[in-house]
Amino acid sequence: MSITNSREFTINVGKIAEAEKWLSEGADLWKEITGKDAVIYKEGWGDQYKMLFVTTYESMGETEEVGDKVMADKRIVDWIQNGMTNGDLISGAVDRFFTTIKDTRE
C-alpha cells in the first residue's frame, strides 16, 4: 500500500512562469537528494493558479525519513526560502496524504 503526498501551492498573481521554474528546480533537487520522483501539476485559469508537487512513498515511515533527509539539506531550505519569501511566488501551501487503495497500473 503506497502513500501519495501532495503539496498544493497557491501561486501569487503574476508569478506563474517564475513559480513553474522554481518548482521544476525543486523537483530536480528533490530527486537528487532523495532519489524519489516528483510530479508537478498546474491547475487554474487567468491569474488564479495552484500547483501540486506530488511524490509517492512506500509507507508513512518513509515520508518521515525523506522529510528529515531533505530538511537537513541546506539546498532545500534555501530553495524554500527563495520561493516563499524572497521570490514572493506563493501565498500558501497545504500538504495532503493519500493512501492508495487500488492502482490498475501495477
PLM region spans:
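Short, flexible active-site-adjacent loop segments at beta-strand->alpha-helix junctions, enriched
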Residues: 44, 101-102
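Active-site-flanking beta-strand signature of metal-NTP-handling nucleotidyl enzymes
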Residues: 3-9, 52
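Short acidic DE-rich linear segments
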Residues: 105-106
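Short, surface-exposed ligand-recognition loops at beta-strand->loop->(often short) alpha-helix junctions
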Residues: 10-21
